[in-house]
């Protein structure tokens, strides 16, 4: 799995646990076992998200300059910054996730997920018949 996928899963799990169908922040009412597994998975991917933010900030400092009291990447360094960030996001990592059964997935309602998020959910967080 790439770090970029872990970041996308972080965003999706956050949506599932803490937003309603209109995107408002709420703690969703989910069965204990579903919430438990998703929270365990969130613990895994949140570490990747924190490292990503740390790396992104480091790269902004390296390839940026202070402008109006805020660090921003300079125009002449923008392509290098993007390349370095993409290299980092393409880094392979290995995680063992708590997967959900089809029945458990059925308890998750009204989540606005992007197609790529759903693909990652299916690949990494759902149990297939082979897993059972």
Residue ranges and their predicted role:
Residues 1-132:
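A composition-driven surface/loop motif
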